[in-house]
Amino acid sequence: AELVRKYGTEGFLARKAAVLNHSHVYIRQALAPYQGRSARAEILIEDDAASAEPMRLAVEVTIGDGTLKADFTGTEAQRANGLNCPVASTISMAHYAVQAVFAPDQLLNDGFNRAIALVLPKDSLINPRAPAAVSCRHLTEQAVADVVLKALAQIAPDLSTAGSQISFPTFGIGGFDQRRPGEPRYFVTGDILGGGMGAGRGRAGASGVDCHGSNCALISGEIMEMTGPVRVVGTRLVPGSGGAGAAPGGLAIERVYEVLTDGLTVSGYLQQTRPETVPWGVDGGGAGAPAAVWIERAGGGSEPLVSKFIGVSMNRGDRLFLRSAGGAGWGHATLDA
């Protein structure tokens, strides 16, 4: 309203059109040097909820005359779990990936979007038919960005990066705090970790960051301890977790949580825990180290958990270890980036 009052209706509409036109012209010019190039990419992500079989995302990216087409034909059918990704989230993350490579300093608006065409198979993991469970869509929408970036690394390698962590390790833990006299107090708390970003040509990946569509921060250890009977024992960057390369990938985060009372229950999820799902290297760069989660019991023994774990019991002195994935490397380690 303020802009309309300042410039008038016609002046406002003219300026809006100019902004959209600028974005459209910019992305068309950015794509022009790559006209005629095409690349296909696939990645796998864990299910471990409805099935032990991983889920496949596939895309073929083709650059036309100032246009980009991303065809996701070959992507897995929707599944009976919350990992299905609503089409709006799919579109958002595909556009993000294109912007990150070709126009990182430009506005993402409808002028930019007009240059991009998406083919999204119906009844698929990235365009599910209602009713479909979508509560954990953020895991799959991260993978949408990842697979598009993997294709673009073949088309515009100087502008791209290797695979980043999309492991999104998170958990929730709850129960009754029985440390004090009187009626036990119910609590719930949790945390989310960042990890390693993929390297680019001539630039190492950032360590301990959220990537792509995620914007979460580590919860302060002091805040967590105020919330309930869970202590943050330690937080560290994991040495050697970034993929080797002329430019190495960023390092993962590991955090350790100790339970201070009995009878708690923990659930959570993460991705990129298997050799076939870890962040991918480019031009000879090494893969990022996998994510992991496990419990070390107070009485001894270590208990690895799968990528989706529900209702695991924890008691006083037990420790939960949560580790994200490292970013992948770029180029052979023996060569200059």
Q: How should each PLM-predicted stretch be described?
A:
Residues 1-337:
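Glycine/proline-enriched, intrinsically flexible loops and inter-domain linkers
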